[in-house]
Amino acid sequence: AFVPWFGMQLTTGNSLIGARRQVYEPSLLEESGGRGKPPGMETPPERVEPGESRPEGHVYHFLLPDYEMANYSTSGGPGDLAEEEIKELRSWRRDQKSGYDAEDLKTLQQLSQAIDGLWEKHTRQQRRIREQTTDPIKVWGQPEPDSMRPPTTTRRKDEKWHTEMHSEGVRMSSPYRRLKLVMDYWCALWFWPIDEHDTVPTRQEWLMDLQMILEGDLYETQTTAGEQQVLFESMEPEAKQLAMDLKDEHGFVNVDKLCDRSLRLGLVQELADRYKFHHWELEYADLFERCGGFDLTIGNPPWVKVTWDDTGILSDEEPKIEVRGWSENKMPIRG
């Protein structure tokens, strides 16, 4: 029987906030968008279908700004307390609406090409880990498994997942970590805190940050306590080869050190942890490539808007409020 490891079947995140494998045609990015929007915003991006390649020259949407990023109102609420800061963020948004010149467009295309290479390696790595953590089990009445290798322990599965996929305790970050940071960066700009208005990146700073993540080799590579040179020294040959190919083709990147040394990237990671950005096609890249999606998903989508309910909250402490149907002005006040 097919018995997949539960650790690769379950992810945590906000299913409504994430980046996708969608792209813009380069000609749409050469001029400012209509109605003061950034380039390309008048036209929906095209999806790169599972198993297909990105069209030549097209640019991934999560490398580009959106006119709703860091969008706060100056009237009421936070606008009364931070009007000047919000005006600075508004000025930043206006700066994003100009078209890209030939040099910047070439940079975006090179970054998109780097994403393609990292995505292919991530998909291959995820597929291999899934195969190695799926145990064949005999079930009466079912066909014999093709292979009856001994099952791996949960500890070994966890170890493989956390080190090879999430690069925990490893100097060179996996393709997954690098891609996730880039996609998280795009999401984080929608939630950029007002009190961090002076750290929001200019267009050139954003491109430079993306180059550090995707192309690498900008920081020293000395080890620190508890870290390993690349990945497990006891790793299988295929995993070792993938790590060497990754360094040769996409440079050396330590995501954790990048985030420690860069205020912006550190804030991106903090916002990602807080809001739980979830990129479906990245989290299940091998499944999307193999079958285009899912036959069945189980979870708790955030369909219900979270609101404050005086009666419901206070009745947890004093049930009489709910039982007697007291209105707000009749609720007892406790010191």
What role is predicted for each listed range?
Residues 1-335:
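SAM-dependent methyltransferase catalytic region
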